[in-house]
Amino acid sequence: MYIVGVMSGTSLDGIDVALVRIEGSGVESKVELIHFTTVPFCNDIKSEIQQALSIENSNVQLICSLNFKLGLCFANAVKEVCKEANFSLEQLDLIGSHGQTIYHQPKQDGNRIPSTLQIGEPAVIAYETNTTVISNFRTMDMAAGGQGAPLVPYSEVILYRDPSKNRLLQNIGGISNVTVIPSQQSDQNVIAFDTGPGNMIIDEVCQRLFQLPYDQNGEIAKQGRVVDEILTYCMSHPFLKMNPPKSTGREQFGEKFVSELLKRFEKHSKENILTTVTMFTVNSIVHHYKKFILPYYEIDEVILGGGGSYNSTLVEMLRNGLKDENCAIFIQEDIGYSSEAKEAIAFAILANETHHRNPSNVPSATGAKQSVVLGNITFPPL
């Protein structure tokens, strides 16, 4: 089957689209990436998403309209990846669209029950591409008592499980998440959870203090030093004290968190602040490894993916943080995969599993009561 996976993440970089060929299903799936591209959001759409993400500034009219606008954006992104690959849209079998997360509440808060909302109307995508769309992957897991995240572990087992090595797959996107993939010889369970912020705080600080969208290659963070009192404040965040399975997002590490941090520590240089929040991402990862993974698993390799794997300052900090753990650290490209394409490929794989009516959540990662088939299916017009 030829499937396009569509992902728009918490970092709002743009729309990641991967054209993938998949043979079979389940752990025996054969997955080939044909082409990957990122289609940037225009400034108007990006600002509308940012407004929709803000509890203070959002409104139902905005979200209703944006749902259809993003559906059209996602459809155009599907057309673009096919065009770049010289692949006829008529040959496409399926689209797996994650959507744009507007709000994610994994745990009950007062009378607000666990819930999640991703937008990007699948009917618009199906109509514009004349292709069946599978979307809304998180909701069935949450209906089954899970947190709706992380969902990528299922695809990571298919792509990265090794005959003899125990691997950690560390994604550093807007949020960071880790998947523990025991070797094929092991009887230990796959586990996965969010470790905290990835690029989200770093990017927000860059935008506010340097008027830059992100810290390219970690060049600015390389110039500063870590401020202990800022790092201690960050590491005291309640999320780090929670036991897995757990997930987080912009609600905990977005604009509100950064506003409070910058107000509290405004006396410090902007370079030092950026260096310190970069170290916060690293320390939150290392903290979770040492508390929840390394006491129970012997890890041979850590494989980094996501935009953060291109931040050489962050990667070097992580190498230093794990230097005593006797594990090799790679980025996806070192073993023949694309860091950028990882999540888009994952949703192509999840769409394939739904098409075959196979469960594809990992209850040990999400906390769901059982394995479930994920996603809603939207057929194109006849």
From Swiss-Prot:
Q: Name one GO molecular function term.
A: ATP binding
Name the Gene Ontology biological process terms.
Answer: 1,6-anhydro-N-acetyl-beta-muramic acid catabolic process; amino sugar metabolic process; peptidoglycan turnover
Which pathway? Amino-sugar metabolism; 1,6-anhydro-N-acetylmuramate degradation; Cell wall biogenesis; peptidoglycan recycling
Keyword annotations for this protein, in alphabetical order, are: ATP-binding, Carbohydrate metabolism, Kinase, Nucleotide-binding, Transferase
Query: What does it catalyze?
Result: 1,6-anhydro-N-acetyl-beta-muramate + ATP + H2O = N-acetyl-D-muramate 6-phosphate + ADP + H(+)
Q: Which HAMAP family match?
A: AnhMurNAc_kinase (MF_01270)
Instruction: Report the PANTHER family cross-referenced here.
Output: ANHYDRO-N-ACETYLMURAMIC ACID KINASE
Q: What is this protein identified as?
A: Anhydro-N-acetylmuramic acid kinase
Q: What species does this protein belong to?
A: Bacillus thuringiensis subsp. konkukian (strain 97-27)
Gene expressing this chain: anmK
